């Protein structure tokens, strides 16, 4: 086994004494830093490389802190209108994951970069910490690399805002296999529309 395989096995056993101590110390360190800051290098190089990261020019890593818990509806003084069934304020859950929120914040902060992917690096009772891989699409090392030229195209601008990253696709219900029949055709809406449209084919 290579070195990265050993690192992967270490990260799989998060309850081991070594990892518990490491994660505790790292969470303390991340809490002292700002909510969004550039990381000098990948905390999990094995995971980052599996997600497409390379330690070369044009690749950047940002660490993002996201507050855990549900989402409170932003209503002034709790004033909600309409039927009582829609009056909920507190016990609401956001449709997307905290990881996709971290990607969105990093992408908004670094508007000139493209979000490639992200991964978990730690959490405590209040926060979750993610590292987001961003790519500078104007760097010659990226533009001249045939494997990464796809992300330089304009269609991939702010892909994290449109649910095109791995974390964003999960909340959209996209995937392969019998668990993802609700999104056959590209989305939940497309699948619903096809199943609820009556087609009367002409008899010939």
Curated annotation (Swiss-Prot):
Regions that span the bilayer: none
Example GO biological process: cytoplasmic translation
Localization: Cytoplasm
Assigned GO CC terms: cytosolic large ribosomal subunit
Domain of life: Eukaryota
This protein's UniProt keywords: Cytoplasm, Ribonucleoprotein, Ribosomal protein
PANTHER family given in the database record: LARGE RIBOSOMAL SUBUNIT PROTEIN EL15, RIBOSOMAL PROTEIN L15
Family: Belongs to the eukaryotic ribosomal protein eL15 family.
Protein task: Component of the large ribosomal subunit. The ribosome is a large ribonucleoprotein complex responsible for the synthesis of proteins in the cell.
Protein name, per record: Large ribosomal subunit protein eL15
Top-level taxonomy: Eukaryota, Metazoa, Chordata, Craniata, Vertebrata
């Amino acid at each position: 086994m290579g070195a990265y395989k050993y690192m992967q096995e270490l990260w799989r056993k998060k309850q081991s004494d070594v990892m518990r101590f490491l994660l505790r110390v790292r969470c303390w360190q991340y809490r002292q830093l700002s909510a969004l800051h550039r990381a000098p290098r990948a905390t999990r190089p094995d995971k980052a490389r599996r997600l497409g990261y390379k330690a070369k020019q044009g690749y950047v890593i940002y660490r993002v802190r996201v507050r855990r818990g549900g989402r409170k509806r932003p209503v002034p003084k709790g004033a909600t209108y309409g039927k009582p069934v829609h009056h909920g304020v507190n016990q609401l859950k956001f449709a997307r994951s905290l990881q996709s929120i971290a990607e969105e914040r990093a992408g908004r902060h670094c508007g000139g970069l493209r979000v490639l992917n992200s991964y978990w690096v730690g959490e405590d009772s209040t926060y979750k910490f993610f590292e987001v891989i961003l790519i500078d699409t104007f760097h010659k090392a990226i533009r001249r690399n045939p494997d990464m030229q796809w992300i330089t195209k304009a269609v991939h601008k702010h892909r994290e805002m449109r649910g095109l990253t791995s974390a964003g696709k999960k909340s959209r219900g996209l995937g392969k296999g019998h668990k993802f029949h609700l999104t056959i055709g590209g989305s939940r809406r497309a699948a619903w529309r096809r199943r609820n449209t009556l087609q009367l084919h002409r008899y010939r």
